[in-house]
Amino acid sequence: MDKVTPAKLSWREDELGNVVPVSEIFGDVYYSLVDGLNESRYVFLTQNKLPERFEALFSRANSSAASNFSIAELGFGTGLNILATWQLWEHSKQQFHTYFNSQTNLQTSSQDHLKGSRSLTPRLHIISTEKHPLTHADLSRSLESWKHKDTSLVPFVDQLLALYPTLISGCHRLQLAEDVTLDLWLGDACFSLQQLANSYDTLPYGAHIDAWYLDGFAPACNESLWADQIFEQVKRLSKPGTTAATFSSAGVVKRGLMAAGFEIKKTKGFGRKREMLTATKLEPVAVSDDTSDNQGATEYDAKSTLALRSKEQVTLDTHAVTPNEQIAVIGAGVCGLMAAWSLAQRGNAVSLIDKEAPLAGASGNPRALLAPKMTPLAHVAEHLHSISYLYSQRFYRQIDQGEHKIFTPTTTLDLLQKSNVDVHQIAEYPEQMATTLSLDSARDISGLQQQDLTANLYLPQSGLINPKALADKVLTHPNISFKQANIKRITPLQAEAFDDVTEVSEVIEVTADITVQPAKRTKVMLHCESGEVLSVNRVVIAAAFESQSLDARIFEFRKIRGQLSWFEPTTEQLQALPTLPLKYSGYCAPFIPQPGDEAVNSVTPSVPTFLLGASFIRNDLDDEIRLSEHAINHQKLLTALPELSAVLPLPDTEADLYQRWQARVGIRSQTPDYHPLVGAVDEQGLIWTLSGMGSKGYAFAPLCAQVLADMMTAQFVPLPAALLAKLSVHRSSLKKPLS
């Protein structure tokens, strides 16, 4: 994929004194010189009837399973359309809650009501494409005047700027709010839409676009954004009733929309513009003409076969999870935690189940290093390490609002001893993501003045994750409850299997944290070692290498023993050790434990600690601490940093080593192709899995859990089809013999 080229801008003032960016590449303004914000509201919000559609969506939320609304935009530009849409969404939501509370005489506040009814709250999903994105500085400048013009936009603008991604090709998921998601696809629009549509086609059921914003530069300036190939993808991603709006009334736009099956209508344009176009996707109808050679040709008709479409939609969506379903997640490591979080954020009640406790397995290290394994820039859009890293560091920063920090931005220096890129390939990356430091800078930032650090990769956005703080955050979610239970067997039951069951409670013992749905909706039985049987609608298996014992269709992972070591340095050692995380053939990192960390590991809060790891022993399930693997971790560090030999010897005796060095052993689950399993295990969509992440769980799991939740709820996923195929539970590469 081509490298993203940022927009080249000049600036001018509009009639209201606002600073307006002008594209030097296309020779066109980004929005009207009359009033860009109101142009966005008129052309795209009003003409797509979003105020009425949002109101209807929220009005249904209290009486039925909530719906999602999806908008696709061609031309992100300055983000003004997104901001106006998001602002309207929040206004519609507040209007609904104000009305609902007044009608029901609720004594709680709107915010309390929102928390209590989250399972019925609709969600807004916006997908936008941009070939030449603005730099962060240019975006900030372009939006500054709108913050002054409409102060109610300030929090929306600030949040967008805080989440605005590094300009790397591919899809960047931004969680603007709990119920508002923006997938920003950077790169060629036709390619991005094709990737989106291909991902849609690979799933057993999929989402659709409800409204289109066709907001590229004028056809005379940018023909490629109005090409036939673009409208082919618009057709693939739309359904009958999908609307579209565009400022342009050019013939190429009319013809493209009509070819995509839309009925077009001219309406008054904004400001001095005489007219614009709106459009509605029609129902395809197969018609037979006995007098012609075109028997069975497809035409489009606004009023016919709507009943047929409804029937087809039931078939497509029959296995999709609805917002108020009860879901069990088995396994409370990082995969289970992230699966529970993503599903709970979508309104589902989630029971997180583990035979021991959260973080009892390989995910429970004192700290996890978030630093990607790099790839040449041309491959980055389909490289799971890279796109997961970009999403995860945003995710951890965004949810890090508690007393104890989840993510500490430390930066990381990679010594390129096990790297897929060299310094020349690193130079192609934006400096915000990766760069190479001079020898003096590398020495200064690491504190290693005698070490040869000429070959290096500096990762400015990387840092350390505190697993305990993350687990605590997840477990405070109002839609998540934890249950200790050892699940031994899973029995899926179709609804008709309950016809002979007169009383579900007679055969199922249910604990307080699992709510039994009506019999017709209960589809999965979880059989515990204790004899207790739990009833849920869906189950996600996230039990690492034990996942296969719960469902034989899950790949039997390669089992990798890993031992992480840590110790409390002396004052002399602390002065000599690196001051930031390093990657070499292993990795090391200084950190300071937080209060509460001692509940999971042998650490002392507030005392500087140094960790290093990790061993890598295949097909070994022993979880006892080994002195030999302390030595392995120690030797990896000294091989990379020989100058530390004098100040960091291993303790002389085994007793001293056991006393001064601590460790944790985890058994990691790995696939032959090093990609995790994400998706449905069965054809009915009752049993799912998120597993097999090896040592990359804290990097992969946040994004992969988003993908899983999107698949389960029939929404668009933020991955290209080629990468999605690499995560398939039943992919052909899993047939390769393990070694």
UniProtKB/Swiss-Prot annotation:
Residues 1-282 are annotated as: tRNA (mnm(5)s(2)U34)-methyltransferase. It catalyses: 5-aminomethyl-2-thiouridine(34) in tRNA + S-adenosyl-L-methionine = 5-methylaminomethyl-2-thiouridine(34) in tRNA + S-adenosyl-L-homocysteine + H(+). Its main location: cytoplasm. Its EC number is 2.1.1.61, 1.5.-.-. It is found in: Cytoplasm. Catalyzes the last two steps in the biosynthesis of 5-methylaminomethyl-2-thiouridine (mnm(5)s(2)U) at the wobble position (U34) in tRNA. Catalyzes the FAD-dependent demodification of cmnm(5)s(2)U34 to nm(5)s(2)U34, followed by the transfer of a methyl group from S-adenosyl-L-methionine to nm(5)s(2)U34, to form mnm(5)s(2)U34. This is tRNA 5-methylaminomethyl-2-thiouridine biosynthesis bifunctional protein MnmC. It comes from Psychrobacter sp. (strain PRwf-1). One of its GO terms (cellular component) is cytoplasm. In the N-terminal section; belongs to the methyltransferase superfamily. tRNA (mnm(5)s(2)U34)-methyltransferase family. Residues 330-739 are annotated as: FAD-dependent cmnm(5)s(2)U34 oxidoreductase. GO terms for biological process: methylation; tRNA wobble base modification. Disulfide bonds: none annotated. Its cofactor is FAD.
